[in-house]
Amino acid sequence: MGLFDFLSGRKRPKSGVVAVSSDKLEAAILALNRDTAPYQITKCDDGSCDLVAEWKIVDAKWYEIFGKAGLKKAFKVKMRLDVEKSEVRAVDMDYTVSWRAGVPELELHASGFRGQKSEISFGTAYAFSEELEFGQVYNYRFNSAEIKKPLQQAVTDNGWTWRGVAFGKL
């Protein structure tokens, strides 16, 4: 592993590990799905990638005094399998949307990210739920390593190289 591998997020398989077929690699990545995992890995259906791992971190709505508000936050890892190079190119994407509608205001905030990201975050909020009961409306804990490390391990264990993409084509 070279210096630039560390900086770029490239993970190479151990020497002597033979690369499996793309079908076997895809099956190994999809096998990471489990009921207890906070994320889901699926085949990409829009053609922008081969596989996508998505963690829906927060999706909450609540009532405030004279208004309603909400927060939605998600993190995705899109992956493209390059059979010729036995390489998986991956890009991290996240988005956050928060909104508030009340008297006399209407407010919307949205942000997004594309590249390579390492994040640890957490949050909680108490308010009136949509059932008009006071309590916790969201509580989340997020660590991007929990989704990326198993993916990288599955790729390198099967003889392929993991390459993080920040600016280039996936």
State where each predicted segment sits.
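A composition-biased, non-transmembrane "mature-region" signal
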Residues: 1-170
